[in-house]
Swiss-Prot record:
Quaternary structure (record): Homodimer.
Record PANTHER family: OROTIDINE 5'-PHOSPHATE DECARBOXYLASE
Record bears the keyword Nuclease: no
Listed PROSITE patterns: OMPDECASE (PS00156)
Known pathway: Pyrimidine metabolism; UMP biosynthesis via de novo pathway; UMP from orotate: step 2/2
Primary gene name: pyrF
Top-rank taxon: Bacteria
Any matching Pfam family: OMPdecase
Active site (UniProt): 60
Binding site for substrate: 10, 31, 58-67, 117, 179, 188, 208-209
Molecular function (Gene Ontology), one example: orotidine-5'-phosphate decarboxylase activity
Entry-linked InterPro entries: Aldolase_TIM, OMPdecase, OMPdecase_AS, OMPdecase_bac, OMPdeCOase_dom, RibuloseP-bd_barrel
Any Gene Ontology biological process: 'de novo' pyrimidine nucleobase biosynthetic process
Annotated protein name in UniProt: Orotidine 5'-phosphate decarboxylase
Upper lineage: Bacteria, Bacillati, Bacillota, Bacilli, Bacillales
Amino acid sequence: MKNLPIIALDFDSTEAVDQFLDQFNEPLFVKIGMELFYQTGPQLIASIKDRGHDIFLDLKLHDIPNTVGKAMEGLSKLNIDLVNVHAAGGTEMMKQALNGLQKHNPDIKLIAVTQLTSTTETMLHKEQNIQTSIEEAVLNYATLAQSSGLDGIVCSPLEAKLVKNELGNDFLKVTPGIRPKDASSDDQKRITTPEDAKELGSTHIVVGRPITKSENPVASYHKIKESWLG
């Protein structure tokens, strides 16, 4: 699995994806989220793989254990590299997800979403009724994910250092909420730059609009890639 910045393909059609990817002449690591997957279906994955790109299928599965396990068994037949669930579904759900995934392709990495980068501490306390800091809530979910056999988590870069210190370097910390210094934060609340994410312990970063909405996506990608890889 490549250690490149993961480009979030926040589009709603195969045509838009093709138009974007046609600008690049190099292997990429891209993220297919719910919006795109639900609009285009699994066939898009094959066409992106034909271009030589790694794929993070970001569907954030969250249901009863049996349902998630069966769904993940189906997803394991797709040619993807990384997929995720919501850690809030619990350890049994995460274990069933892992079992389902390993039925057809044990090489696919499985990670768990801890807290969305749009979540604030006020939302955590008042809406989720979790009376801890975001850092403690993320670490709790990360610990459950690791104990369930998962490869890592999705978290903000702001929590990556704590997770790294507690759970080790090899446990993946895939971090959205990445913005260059001159970019808008959009709807992300807990954000950092690529350089800071690396320093804080992120193993992979996810970047969307600063690249996909850029006037020059290739140049913006290379700038972020250089900042990330050093």
